[in-house]
Amino acid sequence: MRLPRRAALGLLPLLLLLPPAPEAAKKPTPCHRCRGLVDKFNQGMVDTAKKNFGGGNTAWEEKTLSKYESSEIRLLEILEGLCESSDFECNQMLEAQEEHLEAWWLQLKSEYPDLFEWFCVKTLKVCCSPGTYGPDCLACQGGSQRPCSGNGHCSGDGSRQGDGSCRCHMGYQGPLCTDCMDGYFSSLRNETHSICTACDESCKTCSGLTNRDCGECEVGWVLDEGACVDVDECAAEPPPCSAAQFCKNANGSYTCEECDSSCVGCTGEGPGNCKECISGYAREHGQCADVDECSLAEKTCVRKNENCYNTPGSYVCVCPDGFEETEDACVPPAEAEATEGESPTQLPSREDL
């Protein structure tokens, strides 16, 4: 019995072999698409393997389930569950490759139990076996069993792409990723394995884990009595930071931090480390504090009715709401109105004298 076809099936995997368009460079490669279909098929096998009839008749169940295990009915259930109805790309791929999947299920599964190897590598030829790469599935650098000596990634590993070169993990370098980068040392190396371990942070090169095993000190460190120790850049003369900053030493480096806004020069963070106080601030209890000019014995705002408001490092003089501001005073509303309503002063007439 043949399974119903969703569409006319081609023998060549045209869809999977089409190269991705330049504008769609991030789309899955043919190998990724094939692997995804196989992963879904394998999951379908797991899901349908759990199926049982729960009737309690063991002999009947064994006979029935045995037939179901390799039946076309089970295959159809797996195929029907591979793609969501909205997944156009998955459904299109399945239509193109359903005949291959049917042939493997009904005839070749026992001989080729690894569906990925048979379907994606040998039949469609869009993938390679792990540890191999390129159109001819050549072995990666270091061999297919341990590409890049286990310390890197082989370009094109498992696909028909790439050049087989190694992209080494952090700490490793060389064509086979067996050499250690600066900042790492070889803690194990034999014919099959190479392990690079990070040096102490003070070492540029090293032969062991401590700051006494450095071959060369990192920038910001200096050799002192056989060990690489931190250079205190903040103790240098002249100081490395500007007059409005203070220096903060760190392992192998330093930072320049801004002084508090109340300071003119400083030795550290906050108003308690000012060298001098900025105008509007004065030393109080060991730190620069704002001077409240409005509370001074000598009056700060001298115009009549004027209010004084303190601000950080300064003050402002303001007339109350509704008062008219003049050069000499803040005039209350009633006085201002009276002044505006007065007639000009007239000289007395001769008759009045």
UniProtKB/Swiss-Prot annotation:
- The secretion signal range is 1-24
Which cysteines pair up through disulfides? They are C31-C34, C140-C154, C148-C166, C168-C177, C263-C266, C294-C308, C301-C317, C319-C330
Q: Which GO terms describe its molecular function?
A: calcium ion binding; protein disulfide isomerase activity
The UniProt entry lists the main location of this chain as: endoplasmic reticulum
- Which positions does the entry assign to FU repeats? 193-240, 253-302
Q: What UniProt keywords are attached to this protein's entry?
A: Calcium, Disulfide bond, EGF-like domain, Endoplasmic reticulum, Glycoprotein, Isomerase, Redox-active center, Repeat, Signal
Q: In which tissues is it expressed?
A: Ubiquitously expressed. Highly expressed in skeletal muscle, heart, liver, kidney and placenta.
Biological role stated in the UniProt entry: Protein disulfide isomerase. Might play a role in the unfolded protein response. May regulate transport of alpha4-beta2 neuronal acetylcholine receptor.
**How does this polypeptide assemble, per the annotation?**
Interacts with CHRNA4. Component of a complex containing at least CRELD2, MANF, MATN3 and PDIA4.
Q: What is this protein called?
A: Protein disulfide isomerase CRELD2
